[in-house]
UniProtKB/Swiss-Prot annotation:
NCBIfam families: polynuc_phos, PRK11824.1. Its main location: cytoplasm. SUPFAM superfamilies: Eukaryotic type KH-domain (KH-domain type I), Nucleic acid-binding proteins, Polynucleotide phosphorylase/guanosine pentaphosphate synthase (PNPase/GPSI), domain 3, Ribonuclease PH domain 2-like, Ribosomal protein S5 domain 2-like. One of its GO terms (biological process) is mRNA catabolic process. It comes from Clostridium botulinum (strain Langeland / NCTC 10281 / Type F). Its EC number is 2.7.7.8. This is Polyribonucleotide nucleotidyltransferase. Residues 552-612 form the KH domain. The lineage of its organism: Bacteria, Bacillati, Bacillota, Clostridia, Eubacteriales. GO terms for molecular function: 3'-5'-RNA exonuclease activity; magnesium ion binding; polyribonucleotide nucleotidyltransferase activity; RNA binding.
Length: 702
């Protein structure tokens, strides 16, 4: 039986059909918002997965190009692996939901969001977060706290819920807020240097609308929700926990109080060896339980240290940033490099400039077709001193790369100001917390070193949180390192300039953040950001005046758009010849702007521009031109006076004396002065060598 429920969000209808599709799924809903439709299916394994120490939740976000009436590009005409955007949207769905599952739940859970129809005014990723929450709540899977999501824009000083395409074009803020009815679960934002107060108010504005959507979900669950399955939650054996803590608590505590990370880890390894020696025979089949007890003990000690002793593992104050190091220009042949170090976290970012034709072509459901600025993030195993195979980028690498990219996007100059494609690659050399925000800092250094005229330098910082079990007490921590991230409750990343915020991403391991915590984190991040920006400016205060000698050079010329066809030629014949003859790259825009780029061959750029100017220049009647003879006939000579533009010098116009044979006066390849005497109604050009000579003689006499 099909059940339909409706509500209104931002003046548009949100509709849910339950029982319409996916009859064999634990829960399946067909959800629409305007003409955007997403199908969400939620399922869980019947038994917990053995031998793991994490919750195996997987979220998939599947874009179908038929949803926007497109056929996939390329040779294979079907969707392949998920796009980067699909991966980012899947991560955005995962983050607010994961903390709300019961601790110790080890059953595999999969949520599949399939985008079936897209109206660009209504973002499918926002609908998918709401639908994933509702599907879980309606299912028998032990998930009981609804989560809602909205997008918030800022146009002309007014906040807008779920802005349309036209509004998104004018917004200076792109914010996603996810929340339960009581607390904020997740925030993602990109902005054009938004001040902290405005950002905080925008988050609260979105939070209020989330409460209405949560109420709608609660109504749906009350009517249609299944009875929840009996939970089988993993918990370490009580006897094992008691015995291991009795034996090792003091040793673990002593190790955890060592400030140096390497020394601390070395001491912990020794403690683990002692625990193994003590209990390997007594609890030979309880290895997972022993491992869990060690983890819980470490977590208890670190959290108590932070919350009750006002002490951080490395001895810093709660608002103190680790020592900062900045260096530029360390790679001699690249276009720009930045090496950023914060404590034991170190990132090297390399900037590469290319022609506008080097943009990344996108084949997705969004209207955006290409990307001129991109940032890629690599996290090799050696950055944490581990050994593992090096594969392609995973979801984490893609997510961190996009986060750092978003932080700098509002600061990148337009293609008119800086006619280059820009690629940044951040190599994580050492990781001890917040490498994504170190990538923002490294990217700023690399851009400045490359001579990219960014509006202002940007920096990023990660804020952390420790709360009491009842959530009544909380402490915000500046510049969290790995141990504080691992055992803490929040990773609140903020990037921006001295003027304001350009990106935010935060998620939490607890059941949401209070409003005051969000405000404190924003204020603490600003203080830390300004400190880091000061260090960056000490290293390189402004973009270099000159590009690297190894970087390409681009020149811009403007022509009449009606003349574009003359530059391209039939089947691209003309432009391809220019490219082949001058060894340049040429990008033509519809408005008549032409970008000519060459790698270390400035003469090629000049030659190409000269040819293009000739192709688009109008032949003026009465003007004298220096042309080249291209062909002779018995009635005259054809002369090219501009690239691709020929005229005829009749035999009677070649000389003052009578000419019997054209070749007696000119030959193919000769350069001669000619005057344009006439252009007929078919565009044919008549020339005269005789009149050109006469005019030059007349000018000499004057």
């Amino acid at each position: 039986m099909i059940h339909t429920l409706e509500t209104t969000v931002a003046g548009r209808k949100m509709k849910v059909d339950f029982g319409k599709t996916g009859m064999l799924s634990n829960a399946a809903i067909f959800m629409s918002y305007g003409d955007t439709v997403v199908m969400i299916n939620a399922n869980a394994s019947k038994e917990p997965r053995e031998g793991i120490d994490f919750f195996p939740l997987s979220v998939d976000y599947e874009e179908r190009l038929y949803s926007v009436g497109k056929i996939p590009g390329g040779f294979i005409k079907r969707e392949g692996k998920p796009s980067d955007k699909s991966i980012l949207h899947a991560r955005s769905i995962d983050r607010p939901l994961r903390p709300l599952f019961p601790n110790g739940y080890r059953n595999d859970v999969q949520i599949v969001n399939t985008v079936l129809s897209v109206e660009q005014d209504n973002l499918p990723e926002i609908l998918a977060i709401n639908g994933s929450s509702l599907a879980l709540c309606l299912s028998s899977i032990p998930f009981t706290t609804p989560v809602a999501a909205v997008s918030v824009g800022l146009v002309d000083g007014e906040f807008i819920i779920n802005p349309t395409v036209a509004q998104r074009e004018n917004t200076i803020l792109d914010l996603t807020v996810c929340a339960t009815k009581e607390r904020i679960m997740m925030v993602e934002a990109g902005g054009q240097e938004i001040d902290e107060e405005t950002m905080y108010n925008a988050i609260l504005f979105g939070f209020e609308e989330c409460k209405n959507i949560v109420a709608f979900q609660e109504e749906a669950v009350a009517k249609l929700g299944k009875t929840k399955d009996e939970q089988v939650l993993y918990k370490a054996d009580e006897e094992v926990e008691k015995e291991v803590k009795r034996f090792a608590f003091d040793m673990i505590k002593e190790a955890m109080y060592i400030m140096d990370k390497d020394e601390r880890n070395a001491q912990l390894d020794k403690v683990k060896e002692k625990i193994s020696e003590e209990f390997s025979q007594k609890y030979e089949d309880k290895g997972a339980d022993i491992k869990e007890v060690i983890y819980k003990t470490q977590k208890e000690i670190v959290r108590n240290m932070l919350l009750n002793e006002d002490r951080r593992p490395d001895g810093r104050a709660f608002d103190e940033v680790r020592p900062i190091g900045c260096e530029v220009g360390i790679l001699p042949r690249t276009h720009g490099t930045g090496l950023f170090t914060r404590g034991l976290t170190q990132v090297m970012t390399v900037a590469t400039l290319g022609a506008l034709g080097d943009v990344q072509i996108l084949d997705g459901i969004a209207e955006e077709e290409s990307k001129r600025y991109m940032h890629h993030y690599n996290f090799p195993s050696y950055s944490v001193g581990e050994v593992r195979p090096l594969r392609g980028p995973g979801r984490r690498e893609i997510g961190h790369g996009a986060l750092a990219e978003r932080a700098l996007e509002p600061l990148i100059p337009s293609q008119e100001e800086f006619p280059y494609t820009i690629r940044l690659v951040s190599e994580v050399l050492s990781s001890n917390g917040s490498t994504s925000q170190a990538s923002v800092c490294g990217s700023t250094l690399a851009l400045l070193d490359a001579g990219v005229p960014i509006k202002r330098p940007a920096a990023g910082i990660a804020m952390g949180l420790i709360t009491s079990d009842d959530l009544e007490r909380e402490k915000v921590i500046t510049d969290i390192q790995g141990i504080e991230d691992f055992f803490g409750d929040m990773d609140f990343k903020v990037a921006g300039t001295e003027k304001g915020i350009t990106s935010i991403q935060f998620d939490t391991k607890i059941k949401g953040l209070s409003n005051s915590c969000v405000k404190d984190a924003l204020e603490g991040a600003k203080k830390a950001r300004l400190h880091i920006l000061g260090k960056i400016k000490e290293c390189i205060p402004e973009p270099r005046k000159e590009l690297s000698k190894y970087a390409p050079r681009t020149e811009i010329i403007c022509i009449d758009p009606e003349k574009i066809r003359d530059v391209i030629g039939a089947g691209g014949k003309v432009i391809n010849k220019i490219i082949a003859d001058t060894n340049v790259k040429i990008e033509i825009k519809e408005d008549g702007k032409i970008f000519v780029t060459s790698n270390n061959e400035p003469e090629g750029v000049k030659k190409a521009i000269s040819i293009i100017e000739g192709l688009t220049k109008e032949v003026v009647q009465g003007e004298i031109y220096l042309g080249k003879v291209t062909k002779t006939t018995n009635f005259g000579a054809f002369v090219e006076i501009l690239p691709g533009k020929e005229g005829l010098v009749h035999i009677s116009k070649l000389d003052f004396a009578r000419v019997e044979k054209v070749e007696d006066v000119v030959s193919v390849g000769d350069e001669i002065l000619v005057k344009v005497t006439d252009i007929d109604n078919q565009g044919r050009i008549n020339l005269s060598r005789k009149d050109a000579i006469a005019k030059k003689e007349e000018e000499k006499d004057k």
